[in-house]
Every structure is written in C-alpha cells, then in structure tokens.
C-alpha cells in the first residue's frame, strides 16, 4: 500500500503512487514551452499505447471529467443529419443516450441486462433494419457491474455496415490491451484517472485522423468542440484553447512513465487480472458472490451481490473506511450489490488485507 490516508478500491479516482502525487507540488504556466512540449509527448505516448499504426491516429486532450470527453465526441462527431446507435447495459451507456437526446441527436438503443454483455445478434438486426444509422457507440468496460463488452464484434459489425465506431474505454484503456487500428475504432475515449493511474482533471480522445477532419464545424458546444481543441493542440505545439489542468497533466506524464517502467499495458493487465481473481476467490470463501459471469468479468472492478441476512452496505463502508479502505456502492438497478475495484496502485497484499478485515468480523459477524 502506498502512503495514503485511504486505499481507494474504486474504478477511478484511484490510489496513485507517491511519485505521481509529488509532481503536483509545483506550479506551471499554461503558456510555457516546456509544459506544452510535455503535452505533445503525452499525446504521442497515448497514440503509441493505442496502436502500432500511429500515423493514422491522433490524440485530443479535453479538460474536465471523462464524461466531458465523451460528450465532446458525441457533440462533435455526429453531423446534424446523423443517427447514433448506442449499445448499453449500464449507467455509462445510458449516459451516452442522454447526451445524444440533450443534443437533439437521433438515437436508437440496443439494451441488455446490466449483467449481460451487448447482444451482437440484436445489434446486427438493428443495423440491417435501420439504414439511417451513421455511428455506433459502445462502452468497453461498463463499471456499473464490471462487465466487458465485445468491442471486437461491435466494431467489426459497425465497419461491415459502414458506420463510424465510438468506444468509451474510460475504465479499460491502459489496463487492457487494445489496438484501435486492428479493431477499426474511429474514436476511443478515456480519462487521466483510470488505468494509467493519474489523477482527475482531463479526459482524452484518440481519433482516426481521417474521421476527425470531417468534424470541423459540427460541434454543438464551444468548450467541447473536439475539432477546434485538436486543431489548436496540433498547430500550436500542445496549446489548449482554454486554461488547462497543469498539475494533472504533469501527474499524468509521470503516470505514463511509471506504466512504461511496470512493463507496459500487458504487465499492468496481469497485475489487475491477478488482483481481481484473488479478490473473487477470497470473497467467495466468506460468502460473497459476483453478479457477472466469470467469462464476461473485467479485471477492473467487481460487483458483489448482497449476502442473505442483515447486511448493510453503509456499515460495511464505514467500518472498512476506519481500517483504511474505500469501496463503492452498487449501481445496478434491479439487484442489491456493492463494488470493489482493484486498479490503481493496488497489489496482492492490499487485496488480502481487505478481505482479512471483512473475514475477521470487522463488518459481518
């Protein structure tokens, strides 16, 4: 466990290393050449993490939470006469639908139960029947439950039917290997405070250059204009249009260096995967069962069903917080669950200490 007042067992914000925190002790100017050069390095490193075909893609950094970046894509990429198909099985897919509706974008939904992955057969049926669909969006890791959706199949179908593909990889990018060129992803969205293990403050979009160039003049917002943000960064050496989160960018750059030092995305995936397997096995020993089938479960966060009896999540939360752990309440609409994340600077000994705290009767007697 790192030096921290709590170990965050959440899907982000998450527990960061001491060295990531330390780089935020200093102040920087947004116009400084050294800072803008760092922004350019960050952009390049993100593309190299995303694909080997780096010349075809570019990165746009966007102030705010990851949701801001998702909305920047939805509001900038889809033209006025466009139509969006959203695959949803959780809160974050629903949020994309809500964005589209607020922005007066024609939207159709393929919905499955929160503990079931996107139904590829239904998606293809919708694409066959509705020729007006121009774009298709899917959440890779839906942290409502921790389920992984079949983005390979969704994107393959999307391209088979000539659609632009949008992937919300908020809680998977940097923790699960993804080659966006191989998967034919046109726009991938993620955030600083997820698997790369930075802190909150900006999101980013890795975009296919050819598709991004089509977005000029389409944005439905000034501050969330994806094309204008990219054009400024691209042509003015990493400059942001409006005040950027300088401390967060420095922390993120440090986090990228630490990802490389750990061994890259594959090594980080292995740590997360081992954390999650240990968590499920140990929690199973004391009577807690995950809601998601193992074959669909991500290594990011796990939803556990409330056990029978007099179980109160708030008591669990309060007691674990006293012992230095913070977990997440459930977000599933039909089943009582709570969630435990295992990303961030979290290791085997941390998972064991957590479950030991529960098993000893700290919460459940």
Curated annotation (Swiss-Prot):
UniProt-listed Enzyme Commission number(s): 2.6.1.37
Query: Listed GO molecular functions?
Result: 2-aminoethylphosphonate-pyruvate transaminase activity
Q: Please give the positions of the paired cysteines in each disulfide bond.
A: none
Task: List every position bearing N6-(pyridoxal phosphate)lysine.
Answer: 194
Q: Name one GO biological process term.
A: organic phosphonate catabolic process
UniProt key word Mitochondrion: no
> What's its catalytic activity?
(2-aminoethyl)phosphonate + pyruvate = phosphonoacetaldehyde + L-alanine
- SUPFAM superfamilies per record: PLP-dependent transferases
Classify the source by domain of life. Answer: Bacteria
Give a Pfam family name.
Answer: Aminotran_5
**Keywords on record:** Aminotransferase, Pyridoxal phosphate, Pyruvate, Transferase
Q: Which cofactors must be present for this protein to function?
A: pyridoxal 5'-phosphate
Asked whether the keyword Transferase is assigned, the reply is yes
Membrane spanning residue stretches: none
List, alphabetically, the HAMAP family matched: PhnW_aminotrans_5
Q: Describe, as the record does, how this protein assembles with itself and its partners.
A: Homodimer.
Which NCBIfam families would you find in this protein's record?
Answer: PhnW-AepZ (TIGR03301), PRK13479.1 (NF010006), transamin_PhnW (TIGR02326)
What family is this protein classified in? Belongs to the class-V pyridoxal-phosphate-dependent aminotransferase family. PhnW subfamily.
- What is the role of this chain? Involved in phosphonate degradation.
Q: What is this protein called?
A: 2-aminoethylphosphonate--pyruvate transaminase
- Source organism per entry reads Bacillus cereus (strain ZK / E33L)
